[in-house]
């Protein structure tokens, strides 16, 4: 399920005793250089370093995810590896599906994460729609395939 929330992703309320997942589409080069990723870099510098090191130590990241314990308590950052800047929008959507499926597997056993209607809540902006240039409707359609997750999509 996708729920649209007007507001700032970074002001998402953290339920008592829970952790929230803030997800965004990432490149595989280890650079949160522009768009929403640059905001993540400024707000979570230690997480940015961990993401960068992870990218430099690993290969074949497209279609996978990486969860980082953020600089702030109770916030997990989910990096969705959807592009290395060489993909068409269709390929990015394909890798988005794979990375969301990977994330779903990784968070399925997390007891302490925020849930909506019994489903793990993934909080995100309109991923892929900025620098990666994918029409939001294409990514939205991909997210709708995951009925085991609840997506809070923040729009300004």
From Swiss-Prot:
It is an enzyme of class 3 (hydrolase). Keywords: Hydrolase, Protein phosphatase. The keyword Zinc does not apply. Its EC number is 3.1.3.84. This is ADP-ribose 1''-phosphate phosphatase. Signal peptide: none annotated. It comes from Candida albicans (strain SC5314 / ATCC MYA-2876). Belongs to the POA1 family. The lineage of its organism: Eukaryota, Fungi, Dikarya, Ascomycota, Saccharomycotina. Residues 1-156 form the Macro domain. Highly specific phosphatase involved in the metabolism of ADP-ribose 1''-phosphate (Appr1p) which is produced as a consequence of tRNA splicing. GO terms for biological process: DNA damage response; purine nucleoside metabolic process.
């Amino acid at each position: 399920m996708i729920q649209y929330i007007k507001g700032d992703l970074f002001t998402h309320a953290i339920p008592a005793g829970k952790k929230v997942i803030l997800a965004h589409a990432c490149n595989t080069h280890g650079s949160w250089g522009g768009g929403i990723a640059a905001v993540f870099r400024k707000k979570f510098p230690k997480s940015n370093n961990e993401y960068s090191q992870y990218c430099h130590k690993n290969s074949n990241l497209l279609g996978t995810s990486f969860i980082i314990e953020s600089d702030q308590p109770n916030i997990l950052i989910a990096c969705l590896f959807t592009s290395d800047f060489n993909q068409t929008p269709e390929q990015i959507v394909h890798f988005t599906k794979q990375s969301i499926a990977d994330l779903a597997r990784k968070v399925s056993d997390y007891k302490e994460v925020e849930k909506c209607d019994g489903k793990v809540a993934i909080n995100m902006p309109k991923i892929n729609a900025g620098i990666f240039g994918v029409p939001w409707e294409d990514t939205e359609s991909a997210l709708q395939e995951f009925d085991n997750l609840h997506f809070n999509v923040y729009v300004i």
